[in-house]
Amino acid sequence: AGASGVGTAAIQLLKFSHNPCFVTVGNNDKLRRCVELGADSGFVRHNGSFAKIVSDWAGDAGVDVVLDPVGASYMEDNLSCLTAGGRLVIIGLLGGQKTDVNLGLLMMKRIAVIGSTLRARPISEKSRIMDELKENLWPRLESGEIKPIIEAVLPVTEAEKAHELIAGNETFGKVVLEVSG
């Protein structure tokens, strides 16, 4: 989901920190826009498995980190393209919650699987994360080095339309609901 709000932010953060970035997206236009934003390469998910493409791109070693908002349906490809000692960070479950896992591959590659969500964290931890964002990210937002990518801004009264936009899977970046007053 390189064209999602989180994906577009990750692309910019990786570019800013001089780290390579490979994305998966829903169509060629989204891939083009991700590359324009700073992704090094990518793959249209409807074209099958991305593991071989990532391996060719990254070389035999594979990639160090996968940030995965998809979950179950990407698990096999994610594990295949990670390097020994790599980390799989699961931040969403758009592709399902349950899957079979090749535990032998996990063990042989010493892969760490990390699940992460803000929802389950205590307020004190969320506050600490916000403080870190203010210190490390806000200056880059203020300077324009990193820009939030916003597809549409709609009044909160048009929340249903916002959901339809997102469900249509043609957006690039965030859809924002604006509350006035």
Specify the residue positions occupied by each region the protein language model found.
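Mid-domain Rossmann-like dinucleotide-binding core that forms the NAD(H)/NADP(H) cofactor-binding site
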Residues: 1-47
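Short, well-ordered alpha-helical microsegments
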Residues: 7, 31, 51, 75-76, ...
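Glycine-rich phosphate-binding loop and adjacent beta-alpha segment
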Residues: 25, 73-145, 178-181
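Local beta-strand N-terminus motif with an aromatic residue
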Residues: 39, 62-63, 106, 146, ...
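Short amphipathic alpha-helix with an adjacent loop that forms part of the alpha/beta core around
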Residues: 49-60
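Short conserved AdoMet
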Residues: 58-59, 83, 170-171
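N-terminal Rossmann-like NAD(P) cofactor-binding module of classical short-chain dehydrogenase/reductase
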Residues: 66-67
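C-terminal capping/lid region of NAD(P)-dependent oxidoreductase domains
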Residues: 138, 143-152, 160-181
